[in-house]
Swiss-Prot record:
NCBIfam families according to UniProt: FtsH_fam
Any GO BP annotation: proteolysis
Active site: 442
Annotated SMART domains: AAA
Cellular compartments annotated: Cell inner membrane
Pfam families from the UniProt entry: AAA, AAA_lid_3, FtsH_ext, Peptidase_M41
Segments of this protein annotated with the region Disordered: 641-662
Record protein name field: ATP-dependent zinc metalloprotease FtsH
Gene name, Swiss-Prot/TrEMBL: ftsH
Assigned protein family: In the central section; belongs to the AAA ATPase family.
Amino acid sequence: MKGLIYYMAMNDNNKTPQDPQANNWMKTLLIGGGIIAAMTLAVTFFDGNGGRDHNTTSVAYSEFLNRVDNNGVKDVTIGHDELSGHFTDNSAFKTVAPSDPLLVQRLQSKNVTFRALPEDTVSFWQILLSQFLLPFILFVGLGFLFVRQMQKNGGGGAMGFGKSRARLLTEKQGRVTFKDIAGIEEAREELEEIVDFLKDPTRFSRLGGKIPKGALLVGPPGTGKTLLARAIAGEAGVPFFSISGSDFVEMFVGVGASRVRDMFEQAKKNAPCIIFIDEIDAVGRHRGAGLGNGNDEREQTLNQLLVEMDGFEANEGIIILAATNRPDVLDPALLRPGRFDRQVIVPRPDIEGRLKILQVHMKKTPLAPDVDVRTIARGTPGFSGADLANIVNEAALLAARKGKRLVAMSEFEEAKDKVMMGAERRSVIMTEEEKRSTAYHEAGHALVSLHIPGCDPLHKVTVIPRGRALGVTWNLPERDQLSINIKQMKARLALCFGGRIAEQLVYGEDSLNTGASNDIQQATDMARAMVTEYGMSPKLGWLRYRENQDEVFLGHSVSRSQNISEDTAKIIDQEVRVLVEEGESRARQVLTEHIDELHRLANALIEYETLSGEEAKRAIAGEKITTIEVKPQVTIPLSGGASGVPKSPPFNGWGNAAPQGA
């Protein structure tokens, strides 16, 4: 018995406090259930049939008369349209009473006891209760519950819409530390200083330093901005609130501003603390934007956020972290010191950064002895941290699919090709003619890149459909490129036209098709940028002539006018055409002079389907290629009516590692 009491006492001591919001909802349900029960009892109490025997049997009127004639009826109660009573065996009955003037005489002749009931009338109290009091009590009760719920939510909107959706993260929830972050050392050091300030404020305050009120993480997608915030949550040792910029604005007016107020009220109660707003551009966009009324719900939310961050009331001990990949669309008032004191740039990693990132992601991956991490890092310029993590994951999945116990270098190469060029689509079956046309197209791109100085080295060329392309030529820079000169841009212009010109030289002028549309788009965009943005036209000089391409929602394009005259626009078009025709002429000259090499490379692609840069050079030189396993060729017609004309993947911007051609 003592043991049982001790066990129960221990359980009582170990109970965690219940959620007050759950208790409030339980109380609301109990009150509502009580109101419904009271209404049911009241209706039952005032029901005129409440005292009737529930074991009553309904009988036909003819059977009732037979029972009367046979002395089988004990007593009868005559109502307005119903007869009820008891048979001689004390069983109750009821029946519908027609207008029968001889009924009373028949009952008297058989000595049946009977009585008559007055016509049913509804009392005043029943009318008052059912038609006025009960609905009034119901509405008053619902209104009372609604007001109570509004008060509990702090007046922040209907049924809690105004409550902040910021999530308080604990140290155990997805704990990430700065040790899990690599490749972005400068950004990490900037944020480590904030964590050090929270842990030891006197170290900085004794020299007059103040803790930064906010830090904005800026960088391309996938570079680790959110991961840095998670690391701060794991290292800071203070409450960490996380929310997305899209969580503020709802369809109800005033909800966003109310959520901002509620979020900062929670933060003040938990100060010192950190608030992290992911994708802040969803709420912090430039005010006065768009074609309609600028004073929309989003702007009210932004105004409240500005006031809370650095307004009349100081928020001591609250640090705001935010992340965005669109700093150009943010409101200037949001970016000023006092709100975001620091803008931490999170760039794509260089080769050393990629090496460290790969090492972090490979910790839990069993690697084969032939895996060279530095080679993988060198072959992935322009990759973000998310891209590198995806490569490691894809390589592990490929090895598991093949039944291997270790992930080899071949899986990493295949995973890199999949991430960069798309997955192989071997189910797309091409005819021999379509495959040959694709081979000459890709061979044209590859040959131009090998013979024109300024092109990135040829990494791989394939006629296997990948992604949305039926063939891909992949040129990979030898190192990270921070800028690109005019020689390289003109070489890329020639590279864009290598595929179509190769098809023309082999199949004639009638071979023009839609497959080079993406190549033409890339060349046109590059040439126009050279003329209007980069000042690479001698005739137009070092001026910016870019047309107004700002988005309407930024509020700029509506108020700006074109500062280019018609004559200048004509000159721009002429200069763009000159650059494009120059690239086309260079590509045609190279392919015409090396037509034999074009045939050899195309035949090698038809035979082997995929060639690396070195293997392509050996094929051009007429040397034997022995390192590739020959794949069987299929000449079944292309299914689904798809075109056999190769198309290249979308261009990913200058200076980045993007597949060229097809």
